[in-house]
Design a protein with these regions (language model features):
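P-loop NTP-binding catalytic core
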Residues: 12-80
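Conserved P-loop NTPase
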Residues: 27, 41-49, 256-272
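Hydrophobic anchor at the beta1->P-loop junction of P-loop NTPases
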Residues: 86
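The conserved Walker
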Residues: 90
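Conserved lysine of the Walker
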Residues: 94
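Hydrophobic positions on the alpha1 helix immediately C-terminal to the Walker A/P-loop
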Residues: 97, 101
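P-loop NTPase switch/communication element
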Residues: 106-111, 146-187
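Conserved P-loop NTPase nucleotide-binding/switch module
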Residues: 171-172, 198-257, 262
């Protein structure tokens, strides 16, 4: 209890809703997971008391960690980010990578060569007979955008205050100069709010899962916005078995899937 009171600056009551969900996020984006005896009301968790177990996760930003995959996730013609889903088990760097992608898209940065040693070559095959016109248009579009990620307005729904690490409404992490943040807001409601009020070109959310999240994603995509999202899983096979998400994947709304692991440390890109 003393540790929690210290982390919450003696205002533990202000974190009641977060604690009910099993965590609290403190200044700097650091998250403290809590466990103990749950108190139920009408079959739902009302509170956790006493809290007897803690798990502290320290947040840290890695500027530039998304540079290795940004060209793969960028449309070469428009410079826009593609609809992307980051897949990783806990503690494998998906939120860190998402945060840097948000910063990159918001500020706009030059892309890298498409060839990559991460998962093999991502070079487009050379145009064969009958494809000269299409190849020529692609070259012209690449020249037009100069291989850059175009700066775009980004709306972030930061339900657990881990992406932007807002303190008194101000992001403590660098999420770009064109980014608007809804802090401590449920994902599904937040996505709808951003579309209606902030006119984002890209919407970013962490750890999607529930049916409400997926319905909100459909709405956002149908409005013409791009999506950057993450989900827990070890592989594509894992997430295809998740209820609700499997049918969503069959709609082929995401253009890129990035699987992360920790084979060579957190944030290792296993497949794209």
């Amino acid at each position: 209890d003393e540790t929690l009171q210290c982390a919450a600056r003696s205002s533990l009551y202000a974190y009641g809703e977060e604690i009910r969900q099993g965590f609290l996020t403190v200044q700097g984006g650091h998250r403290i997971g809590v466990a103990g005896r749950t108190i139920l009301e009408n079959g739902h968790i009302k509170a956790i008391h006493p809290i007897t177990f803690l798990n502290v996760r320290f947040s840290h930003q890695m500027i530039g960690c998304a540079a290795k995959i940004r060209s793969i996730l960028t449309d070469p013609g428009t410079g826009s980010i593609r609809n992307t889903l980051l897949i990783a088990p806990p503690r494998c760097g998906k939120t860190t990578l998402l945060r840097d992608l948000i910063r990159m898209v918001s500020d706009g940065e030059e892309g890298k060569d498409r060839g990559s040693a991460l998962t093999g070559s991502f070079e487009r095959p050379k145009a064969g007979a009958g494809h000269e016109n299409k190849a020529g248009k692609m070259v012209e579009m690449r020249k037009q955008h100069g291989g850059k990620v175009r700066a775009q307005t980004v709306g972030v729904v930061d339900e657990r205050s881990e992406i932007a690490a807002c303190y008194q409404g101000i992001p403590q992490n660098d999420v770009g100069c064109r980014t608007d943040v809804l802090d401590a807001c449920p994902k599904a409601e937040g996505m709808m709010m951003l579309i209606r009020s902030m006119a984002p070109e890209v919407v970013a959310v962490d750890e999607i899962g529930g049916e409400n999240d997926l319905e909100a994603l459909r709405y956002v995509m149908n409005c013409g916005c791009r999506i950057l999202a993450t989900v827990h899983g070890n592989s594509m096979e894992d997430i295809r078995e998740k209820p609700g998400l499997s049918s969503f994947l069959q709609e082929k709304r995401f253009e890129r899937y990035v699987v992360l692991g920790n084979r060579r440390g957190p944030g290792t890109v296993e497949a794209v």
